[in-house]
């Protein structure tokens, strides 16, 4: 019964860490990632659709991305969506593909993006702490219902705290690594 709570807690905390890493992939660092375009939607016959579902997106070098739509009639729509997304780049449409040339980041931009990474990390920590609180509430309910003793409850809550500390440590390391990657010139 307690093992199930531990496993569920670990699983939920791991999902929070995975969500943080997905969020990090949308932040720009020294090398531009195709994931920076993940949130951009294109109007595909009346349906908002992600870019990677209407064409291939690839990195040509550290500062250039190329979008090759599967249907050439989508070029203008993709171009419009990128401009509206306000990601700090103008699309270059050559009639076949769209190239995005990202200028090198200024020190100020790097600091702002690093600040965003830190905020994402704090959000993940809050999620982990909420998961800890839910697990502790389940343990307290078991104690209240006389399914476990007070000693077992205290030990279980200590175990949940250890799991939480590991998750927070992982988040802190991820944030530090991302900040280092962003601030590296």
UniProtKB/Swiss-Prot annotation:
Q: What InterPro entries would the database entry show?
A: Ribosome_recyc_fac, Ribosome_recyc_fac_dom, RRF_sf
- Any idea which UniProt keywords this protein has? Cytoplasm, Protein biosynthesis
Q: Name one GO biological process term.
A: cytoplasmic translational termination
UniProt-listed Pfam families: RRF (PF01765)
One Gene Ontology CC term in the entry: cytosol
Annotated localization: Cytoplasm
Q: Which GO terms describe its molecular function?
A: ribosomal large subunit binding
Q: Does the keyword Protein biosynthesis apply?
A: yes
* Role description: Responsible for the release of ribosomes from messenger RNA at the termination of protein biosynthesis. May increase the efficiency of translation by recycling ribosomes from one round of translation to another.
Which family does the entry's similarity section mention? Belongs to the RRF family.
Name this protein carries in UniProt? Ribosome-recycling factor
Q: Which organism is it from?
A: Helicobacter pylori (strain Shi470)
Q: Which gene encodes it?
A: frr
